[in-house]
Amino acid sequence: EKMVDTTDEWITTRTGIKERRILRTPGKATSDMGLEVVRQLLEKTGTKPEEIDLLICATVTPDTTFPDTANTILDKAGAKNAFGFDINAACSGFLFALTTGSKFIESGMYKKVIVIGADKMSAIVDYSDRSTCIIFGDGAGGVLLEPNTEGNGVIDAILKSDGSGREFLHMKAGGSLKPATPETVANKEHFVFQDGKPVFKAAVTGMVTTVNQVLARNNMTTEDIDWLVPHQANMRIINSV
């Protein structure tokens, strides 16, 4: 069934995206995808749930406004000795969470920290809006952070925020500024709104600037880099960077 006026060729040419995964199981939410990540991490590393000290979940699609999705994941995973919290930073969320988690390890405060990025974007995407529905899908991933004596880890991080661009990518209603009403729901104001051109420009400029800054701060050049792993919302953004 065709939902918007587009084709696979049009989408692929402009975004590089071939498919989007959607969580369709009734009653399943972001925490369920996060739980699967935790289970796989614990199994892969031979770690018991009660050994986890902290779980950080980067998400803009929490199961509910509160409690934190991280705490729901911990409960479902049986990690009774851990505490958790969410980070809401959208596309930058996993990097923010990874840097935060690494600092808890480096400080010596905790030994085992799980960092998850998880979103059920299908819950907040308008599938009649071509500017957003062709981009977003559902998914989750994560890492288990532990101390090591080999000098490996997060070498450096530069994190930035620019709230002045919020008018170009946001949700119009549903928060404390404009609580949900029958009118806001009817007007589809609880879905993602995006103005693509300024978002594209900001993404390219921001990534290039930050990459150059972190290289310069560590006395490195692009010739020293084997891999650049960017945010993957759009192939044209990646190619421009």
Predicted regions and their residues:
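Conserved catalytic cysteine-centered active-site region
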Residues: W10-R14, K18-D32, V60-V113
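Short acidic capping loops at alpha-helix termini that bridge into adjacent secondary structure
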Residues: E9, K48-L54, N81-F83, K111-V113, ...
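Acidic, glycine-rich active-site loops and adjacent beta-strand->loop/helix elements
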Residues: A58-D63, A89-S92, G117-S122, K160-D162
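Phosphate/pyrophosphate-binding loops at sites that engage ATP/ADP/AMP, CoA/4′-phosphopantetheine
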Residues: V37-D53, T209-D226
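Buried hydrophobic positions in well-ordered alpha/beta secondary-structure cores of metabolic enzymes
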Residues: I11, L41, I52-L55, I73, ...
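Glycine-rich phosphate-binding loops at beta-strand->alpha-helix junctions
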Residues: A58-T64, I225-V241
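Flexible, glycine-rich active-site loops centered on histidine and acidic residues
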Residues: E106-A140
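Condensing-enzyme catalytic core mediating Claisen C-C bond formation in acyl metabolism
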Residues: E1-G27, D129-K201, T205, T209
